Amino acid sequence: MISNVAGAGVRVGIGVFVFRGGRFLMGCRRGAHGAGTWSVPGGHLEFGESFEDTAVREVAEETGVQIGNVRFGAVTNDVFTGEGRHYVTVWMLSDHVAGEPVVLEPDKCTGLAWHDFDDLPEPLFLPWRQLVRSPHFDAIRRELSAAR
């Protein structure tokens, strides 16, 4: 067991798969824990906010893209031991509705690109690595295949 870092708590992060044409949107993180790694858009759950509302808000804030059909995908338990952070990441699935992705928060992301599970960029953000090892990963892959 890892001892609790003084004053640290567990936060809830939301990762959002945006499906379009058999691919999903990913960005390279910047300026925060996991800088230089790749993940889907996302952010923190705010007080009183639903997972779905967080997904819609974060994708719009970060990329300008509108999403719909937002649904639960998976959950991972992510401990960043070197940084003294602990997150529960709720992975949401969604469909692209409108807009071309643009980096709207350049202090948090260096680039956006559409990927599929056969061409994942490296290195992946820790919660992504956890997701790939989870029993939920195959179900998310099936969702993407069904969206083609």
Per-segment meaning from a language model:
Residues 1-24, 75, 90-93:
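Conserved N-terminal beta-strand and adjoining loop/helix that marks the start
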Residues 40-72, 92:
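The catalytic Nudix box helix
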Residues 32-38:
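A conserved beta-turn-beta hairpin within the catalytic core of GNAT-like acetyltransferases
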Residues 138-148:
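Acidic/histidine-enriched, glycine/proline-rich intrinsically disordered or flexible terminal extensions
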Residues 91-93, 102-136:
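NUDIX/MutT-family hydrolases
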Residues 77-101, 135-136:
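Active-site-adjacent beta-strand/loop module that shapes the phosphate/pyrophosphate-binding cleft
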Residues 6-10, 37, 82-88, 106-109:
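A generic structural micro-feature
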